[in-house]
Design a protein with these regions (language model features):
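N-terminal metal-binding scaffold of metallo-dependent hydrolase/deaminase domains
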Residues: 1-42, 376
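Alpha-helical scaffold segments that flank or form the walls of functional sites
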Residues: 54, 72-136, 157-171
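Hydrophobic faces of well-ordered beta-strands that scaffold small-molecule active sites
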Residues: 58-64, 118-119, 138-141, 176-180, ...
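Active-site gating loops and adjacent loop-to-helix segments of metal-dependent hydrolytic enzymes
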Residues: 70-101, 135, 139-145, 212-258
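Active-site glycine- and acidic-residue-rich loops that bind
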Residues: 120, 179-195, 264-266, 291-294
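His/Asp/Glu-enriched, well-ordered alpha-helical/loop segment
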Residues: 251-256, 285, 296-373
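C-terminal cap of metal-dependent C-N hydrolases
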Residues: 349, 365-402
Length: 402
């Protein structure tokens, strides 16, 4: 067993506890949360104390690209379509071993930042393998691509084969999902096919959606840089005269999939918000990445007012620079307990994991993080955790043997 005491404990779903403690059972779940004097210290339990720090639920990063960790600082391009082409070139020059090392470093960087659960999208499978090898928690969404309708069958078969291979790696802690990448990289028939596949196999699904003005121009008007690139490849493009969110509704895919995570959702209006709410979609808000690419500002307040589950994500380190979720919260205009809620239980709800993680409650998974008390002030001086624990196992920081 493990007992962690801190100057203040923040359960998130209950008021903060001054001089509090959390007791972790041998099964990796929380046995007790309360004032220090009320939480027992069983014989033989390990104990650690942080009198000047805050103990919080482990942070939840709702959107990462861990396989790109090694590319930090290597793509100065900010015009979005050119940035994407540069990323593809850099990935083409990366070996499978380099992707594996990159993803593992990304997981460790998350632990250093107090992140205990990630929702990662990628094309190589390296993030899922890294999560499984290191005993991390997360959902990995295997990306599917195929903008040409003529390639639907081949693109779907490629994605399904990847899911079969990776299915042997997935577990209850490291889950597998699929991601039909984005409206500019996935055709209408492929969207429908992947959504049907996800529903049949009970796989969570994530999509980059309404991220950029270029994407909106493609869907609404059949114009812009994405449309030009597709036509240059001989791929037919037509105007749908609607927003990207409304486009997916028209395709029927919002009804075809369960566990849907929409990433970014910057270019949205009130009708889009109503669609997302009715579809019970979770959102990943990535303000630093949106700012880096000059996409605009997602309407976070409107998301929350509409009752749409939304968490914060760092996107790739190529865009945001690091996996500092406190900096992400500051970029979203949040601080204190409001920031903490967004980084924990709100993110867990966006991923459909709120019954297991996101708050400090007896019976939940013992995913914990300890930070200097100053982390609850904006801007955070440091995102480095003093201690990070996943399912009762310390993965970052020091715990005495006895």
């Amino acid at each position: 067993m493990l007992r962690v005491r801190a100057g203040s404990v923040h359960p998130v779903t209950a008021p903060p506890i001054s001089d509090g403690a959390v007791l972790v059972a041998d099964d990796g779940r929380i046995a007790a949360v309360g004032a220090h004097a009320d939480v027992p210290l069983p014989p033989g339990a390990r104990r650690v104390e942080f009198p000047d720090a805050v103990l919080v639920p482990g942070l939840v990063n709702t959107h990462t690209h861990l396989e790109l960790t090694h590319l930090a600082g290597r793509n100065p391009e900010r015009e979005f379509s050119r940035w994407i082409r540069t990323i593809r070139s850099l990935k083409d020059a990366t070996t499978p071993e380099e992707f594996d090392h990159s993803a593992e470093q990304g997981v460790r960087d998350c632990w250093t930042a107090g992140v205990t659960c990630v929702a990662d999208t990628g094309s190589t499978g390296a993030p899922l393998r890294a999560l499984a090898r290191l005993g991390a928690r997360g959902i990995y969404y295997q990306e599917g691509f195929g903008p040409d309708p003529a390639d639907r069958a081949a693109s779907l078969a490629e994605l399904q084969a990847a899911v079969v291979r990776l299915g042997h790696v997935a577990s209850a802690r490291t889950r597998l999902g699929v991601s039909p990448h984005a409206p500019y990289s996935v055709s209408e028939p492929l969207y429908r096919a992947v959504a049907d596949f996800a529903r049949r196999e009970s796989l969570p699904l994530a999509v980059h959606l309404a991220e950029s003005r270029e994407e909106t121009a493609l869907v609404r008007d059949g114009a812009g840089s994405f449309a030009e690139a597709l036509r240059a490849r001989g791929i037919p493009v037509r105007a749908h005269h609607c927003s990207p969110v409304q486009y997916l509704l028209q395709l029927g895919v919002l009804e075809r999939a369960t566990g849907w995570l929409s990433i970014h959702c910057v270019q949205v209006d009130e009708r889009d918000l109503d669609i997302l709410r009715q579809a019970r979609v979770g959102l990943a808000h990535c303000p630093r990445s949106n700012r880096a690419h000059r996409h605009g500002t997602a309407p976070l307040a409107a998301f929350r007012a509409a009752g749409i589950p939304v968490g914060l994500g760092t996107d790739s380190v190529v865009s945001a620079g690091d996996v500092n979720l406190w900096a992400e919260a500051a970029a979203a205009g949040l601080d204190g307990e409001d920031a903490l809620r967004m980084l924990t239980i709100a993110g867990a709800r966006a991923l459909g994991l709120e019954s297991e993680i996101g708050s400090l409650e007896a019976g939940k998974q013992a995913d914990l993080a300890v930070f200097p008390a100053t982390v609850l002030h904006r801007p955070p001086p440091s995102s480095t955790a003093l201690l990070t624990v996943i399912a009762g196992r310390p993965v970052h920081g020091y715990i005495p043997a006895q």
